[in-house]
Structure formats: structure tokens, C-alpha cells
């Protein structure tokens, strides 16, 4: 266990409940708290001011940053649920100031040396599942009972409502809003609201964009871009090319680039279509 006495102060130790089990090779900062009956395995590193609740399991190799709260029953760093996994050393890496609620599961990546990565200031609500090789950027909210399959990429500030599944290799764009109980089989464009079974792009996420502090000028530019893609009679490829030529605003550039890559890059699943 890691303690820090570099400043000549009295050596501190993590606050560990007597029923918790900590592997001798685990590295815990002196300010870490570990609740009753939790198990911290080998090759686990936990940063300052992180609180591990009761009945939590963290297996390694896993790195957890500072200021995180991990609630009862969460399981982090177990082997991936992937038949291709051959026992190689892969990782979970979690950033800072995240809330990981009750019974969340976060699996390691499949390939040796690969990473399942969670960024900073995210909220993962109860019973959410993050499968192997997923990447969740920053300030994402994932609601209760969301199941993320492998290799999903979620950009910052996205909002994923409850009780839904997301297909493997899907990308979910920045500041997108996914409605509850939807079936997400293709990429979710940034700044949009997507919902349904089958899912469809319904509109821009106007409330979310306003709450994020986006300017009226940027909102107006995104509205024009959205209308060109989803509400005009312009053929899709031609509309993308027009956006690429005229995208002066960074948000419109991101919108166009996401759609272009989703539509034409190898390995991408293509964007969810607009409503009919």
C-alpha cells in the first residue's frame, strides 16, 4: 500500500475497514478510503481522496485516479466478456472525480496492452455495464441499466438515458442525448437527440446545448447544418460536401467530420438516420 512521507510529515495510511482485503502489491494513496468487505487486487493503483464503498471489487491491472467515489457492489477490472480474450495483460484506466454507482461493472480490454478508459467527471449510474475496450471521455452521464458493448466510444458531455443497449463499435457524439429504452445500433451524431426502436435522429439537443453555454451564433450555425442534413432534399453526400466547404464554426466542423467518418471510414457502423 502506498503512503507518502516525502514532506517529512507523519506517515499516513489509507482508511481501510478491517473486513476489506487488500493485495500487498496494490498501491493506495494515503487518503484513500476502503469500505467493508471490499477486495482490491494485485496491480491496482488508486489515487488521492478516492472513496471505495463496501462490497466493491477492483481487480488489476487497473488505475484509478483522484477524487473518485465508487459505490457498493461495483466490480471494476475483471476479465472481458469476450471469447477472443486469451489471458493477456490488459487494463482499466479511470481518471479523476468520477461517480461510479451501485453495481456498475467495468471490464478490462481484450487485447494484451489495450485499455478500457474512463475520463474525468463522469457519472455512471446503478447497474450500468462498460464492456471491453470502451472509451468514455469527460462529463458523460450514463443512466441506470445501460449496457455498453465492446469498443464503444462516447465523446464528452453525452447523456445516455436508462435501460438501453448500445451495439459494439458504436460512437456517440459530443453533447448528444440518447432517449431511454432505445436500441442503438449505429453512430449517434453529436449535438442531436436520438431515441426509439429502431432509433432515429429526432432533433438537435437544444436544451443540452444551451446548458453547455453554447453561444446563440453557434446554435444558429448548428441549426442550419442540421436542417441541411436532415430536413432538406439535398442528397446526403452532397450535403456533407457543402458542410465541409462552408463549416466556419468549430461545432459545425465537428458535426460534419463525425458524419463523414461515421459514413465512410472502415470499421464504423454509419450514423443513425433521421426520422421519416
Curated annotation (Swiss-Prot):
A cellular-component GO term for this protein: carboxysome
Keywords: Acyltransferase, Cytoplasm, Lipid A biosynthesis, Lipid biosynthesis, Lipid metabolism, Repeat, Transferase
Cellular localisation: Cytoplasm
Main enzyme class: transferase
Pathway per the UniProt entry: Glycolipid biosynthesis; lipid IV(A) biosynthesis; lipid IV(A) from (3R)-3-hydroxytetradecanoyl-[acyl-carrier-protein] and UDP-N-acetyl-alpha-D-glucosamine: step 1/6
Catalytic reaction list: a (3R)-hydroxyacyl-[ACP] + UDP-N-acetyl-alpha-D-glucosamine = a UDP-3-O-[(3R)-3-hydroxyacyl]-N-acetyl-alpha-D-glucosamine + holo-[ACP]
GO biological processes: lipid A biosynthetic process
Principal location listed in the UniProt entry: cytoplasm
Superkingdom as given in the UniProt entry: Bacteria
Family: Belongs to the transferase hexapeptide repeat family. LpxA subfamily.
Described function: Involved in the biosynthesis of lipid A, a phosphorylated glycolipid that anchors the lipopolysaccharide to the outer membrane of the cell.
Protein name: Acyl-[acyl-carrier-protein]--UDP-N-acetylglucosamine O-acyltransferase
Species of the source: Synechocystis sp. (strain ATCC 27184 / PCC 6803 / Kazusa)
Gene name per UniProt: lpxA
